[in-house]
UniProtKB/Swiss-Prot annotation:
GO terms for cellular component: mitochondrial intermembrane space; mitochondrial matrix. Pfam families: Complex1_LYR_2. Residues 1-21 form a transit peptide. One of its GO terms (biological process) is gluconeogenesis. Its main location: mitochondrion. It is found in: Mitochondrion matrix. CDD domains: Complex1_LYR_SDHAF3_LYRM10. This is Succinate dehydrogenase assembly factor 3, mitochondrial.
Amino acid sequence: MQVNHLLRQAVKQTTRAGRLGSRKPHKPLLPPLQLYRRILREHRNLPTMQRELGDQYVKNEFKLHKSTDNPLYIVGFLASWQDYLHMITRGEWEEGTLSTDLLEKMSPEQVTQLYELMKEAEQLKSGGE
């Protein structure tokens, strides 16, 4: 399968290059299936609603990106999900905030989606629908 070959090549390049964004050089990327399973396993420690939402989102994202063949995109995708895995493993998901830099990089549609998600989350947290 060409995707597996490209993935292996991209992971090797990332490991040799050392740093990608906020990644540390001593943490190589996990293979996609292993990363996917570890994320779902780690979601078991989340409250039920967050687990269901997280599981659904992870499954959808991995399914949508399954046919990607751009090595740089694959590395970025895996690096972001691996950072997410480390964040939920350490319990930092509850205090998560977005930096101004990250918000500036988002499209207007993404900002709107994020705002809608925030409103929904606040409604669920307060107990109303």
